[in-house]
Amino acid sequence: MSTIRSFEDLKAKRQEILDRKAARNGKTIINVSLATCSIAAGGKVAMEAMQDEVAKNGLTGVEFMQSSCMTYCYAEPTVEITLPGKDPVVFGGVDENRARELVTEYVMKGEPVEGIIPVNYERVVL
């Protein structure tokens, strides 16, 4: 990560973030927590199952991301899904079966799926 030393650096960083965000518009973003506790709880298996389900159903416009701790250790593995034009939704306790269900029910149909973790923060966009 580059060091921000001036207001111009900050403006350039903001534009870089906005450009990355614009490239994602219209895509479904699936962000899987792969911190140590999530990996130990089966996070990699959940991510692989979701990737397999996306491929099996021929879905396009789905981007996978990996993140570190989402601070929901009690609910690992956790997955944050952002559907186009919607706020992100975080799901907890995502095992292989739940991962596949998230793709077929939530990603493909927009249907709510059990395991939503209530939002306890507000996003700040620079």
Swiss-Prot record:
Q: How does activity depend on pH?
A: Optimum pH is 8.
Q: What class of enzyme is it?
A: oxidoreductase
What GO molecular functions are on record for this protein?
A: hydrogen dehydrogenase (NADP+) activity
**What CDD domains does this protein map onto?**
TRX_Fd_family
Q: Which reaction does it catalyse?
A: H2 + NADP(+) = NADPH + H(+)
How is activity regulated here?
A: Inhibited by oxygen.
Asked if the record carries the keyword Oxidoreductase, the reply is yes
Q: Keywords on this record? A: NADP, Oxidoreductase
* InterPro entries the UniProt entry points to: Thioredoxin-like_sf
What is this enzyme's EC?
1.12.1.3
Summarizing the function annotation, the protein's role is: Catalyzes the reduction of NADP in the presence of molecular H2 to yield NADPH.
Q: How does it assemble?
A: Heterotetramer composed of HndA, HndB, HndC and HndD subunits. HndA and HndB could form a heterodimeric intermediate in the electron transfer between the active site of hydrogenase subunit HndD and the NADP reduction site of the reducing subunit HndC.
Q: What protein am I looking at?
A: NADP-reducing hydrogenase subunit HndB
Annotated source species: Solidesulfovibrio fructosivorans (Desulfovibrio fructosivorans)
